[in-house]
Swiss-Prot record:
It comes from Streptococcus pneumoniae (strain ATCC BAA-255 / R6). It catalyses: Hydrolysis of proteins to small peptides in the presence of ATP and magnesium. alpha-casein is the usual test substrate. In the absence of ATP, only oligopeptides shorter than five residues are hydrolyzed (such as succinyl-Leu-Tyr-|-NHMec, and Leu-Tyr-Leu-|-Tyr-Trp, in which cleavage of the -Tyr-|-Leu- and -Tyr-|-Trp bonds also occurs). The active site is at S96 (nucleophile), H121. PANTHER family: ATP-DEPENDENT CLP PROTEASE PROTEOLYTIC SUBUNIT. This is ATP-dependent Clp protease proteolytic subunit. Keywords: Cytoplasm, Hydrolase, Protease, Serine protease.
Amino acid sequence: MIPVVIEQTSRGERSYDIYSRLLKDRIIMLTGPVEDNMANSVIAQLLFLDAQDSTKDIYLYVNTPGGSVSAGLAIVDTMNFIKADVQTIVMGMAASMGTVIASSGAKGKRFMLPNAEYMIHQPMGGTGGGTQQTDMAIAAEHLLKTRNTLEKILAENSGQSMEKVHADAERDNWMSAQETLEYGFIDEIMANNSLN
């Protein structure tokens, strides 16, 4: 169930679903697994807000365990494509593909709530049963290219070397807000709503 909020206007009352009301304040919620439908919704909202006013920041609240690499990279590419700065605010967690998205916010405008967590790791992949060896080799090569692409983005976003990111992402690597700040994925830990 999606909550509804009611606003008083000069013409009376107007009701909105909560996400439409937040969008009016340039807030986008990126929550749950990253998949194509969710990514398309986030991308549409980014494009809409940028077309509406590209001089005002967009606030992207992130709480995701990660998910589809292609869907996540579509979000990241759109964040970089639009003119408006995208502030990212991690609440709960940004894991896996979520770290790539959250760390791709505008430099100086990447935030995290005090009890949120970050997690980086190498991308996962697999082949279904009955897969031919040649197809397995192609899938393995693609997975290595994908890992390199993601680690390059994470290195650029954090200021760490590719070698360090590669080593740190070898297994699930959970980070507290303070550790995430020290690593360079965020710019500030927020204790209260001080966004402007």
